[in-house]
Amino acid sequence: AVGVVAYNGYTNTAKKNAVKTMHSQVIKFIKSEIIKCDMGEDKVMNGNLNCSDRFIANKIGAATQASFEGKFLNPFVSYKENVVAGQAPHQNGTCIIQYNSGGILVSNINTSVGGTLVRVSTCYGETTRLYEEWIVK
């Protein structure tokens, strides 16, 4: 019985670490693809985002989801895609029930100061999450 508890703890930690790595890779992917737009590319994110659309609400989120389709599977819920476009990911630090474990939500919204605010939020436990946001101009 002790071995089962230790094994379950090990696999849970491995799943959390996998989700943290995926979260980081999604952020790096988005930032590097937006830089390509700034350098004059017309389409990025495997052809899923027209650079001229990067300031339109939810376009970056939808393009990111399409780019990662079938590539990152949720280690906690194996039948679910792991990268999902969402309008307001994990608001106020609360993980949405459907994505409590392993879901990476990506959104972008227009800002009053120009540009678009990109948000990447990932839950890897009941209340534990990673969150990063930045403005693309």
Predicted regions mapped to residue ranges:
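Periplasmic/extracellular, small/polar-rich flexible segments of pilin-like filament-forming proteins
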Residues: 35-137
